Amino acid sequence: MKTTMNQNPIKTTKVMSKIIVTIVFFISSYVSAQGQFEQGMGKALQLWGEGKSTEASALFERIAAAEKSSWLPNYYVALVNTNAAFGTKDKEQVSLLLDKAQKALDVEMDKNPNNAELLVVQAMIHTAWIAFDPMTNGQKLAGPVMELYAKANAIAPENPRVVFCKAEFEIGGAKFWGTDTKPMCAQIEKAIGLFATFKPETVFSPSWGLERAQIAQKNCK
């Protein structure tokens, strides 16, 4: 299927920053008097919240090298750099950011290819490439993105990020083709409900997405 969809499902920097705000809010009161891993993760998230993506990524990378049993540091390396790529127009910089994100994610995907949170970030990396150059990347990556979301949805159908991000991407395709977005809007509403009951495994586990979903709901037609 040929597509040159002008994917911008994440509304670049302003909307992506909601991820940072949400994460920092949940960890801000937690990191004092914790162990080295917790303190490092808290510091890295704080740096990200301050807009210091490069420093945050570097610290997450150091934590990942020291704590190989946790998938979260590399997850955040991938998320931080993918987030930064959405706000970048320079081709060389986008390539550097997304290559770093991909390498970090690959480490954890090799360990657990059925982690739905990792699958969502892989889909986001592909989407960042599409958003940067839809004419070149839309045709070859739109299909893999949908396959990733389908797999994630089969694994974790009640995960709000899976439901929301899948619907958000599908809305981009529907708008490009001029098809009805109501089914996707219904899925966004479902995701908002799932956020209300979703319980992260740890304070550092993924919990972002509600504010993005609420913004998408307001814009849903």
Give the role of each language-model region:
Residues 35-42, 66-87, 114-132, 160-173, ...:
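Amphipathic alpha-helical repeat scaffolds of TPR domains
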Residues 97, 102, 139-147, 178-199:
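TPR/TPR-like (Sel1-like) alpha-helical repeat modules
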Residues 137-145, 149-152, 157-163, 170-179:
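Outer-membrane beta-barrel transmembrane domain signature
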Residues 44-48, 85-97, 129-141, 173-183:
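Short coil/turn connectors between adjacent alpha-helices in alpha-solenoid helical repeat scaffolds
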Residues 63, 108, 151-152, 191:
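Canonical positions in the second alpha-helix
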Residues 1-40:
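Bacterial Sec-dependent N-terminal signal peptides
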Residues 39-54, 59, 87:
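Alpha-helical segment of the N-proximal tetratricopeptide repeat
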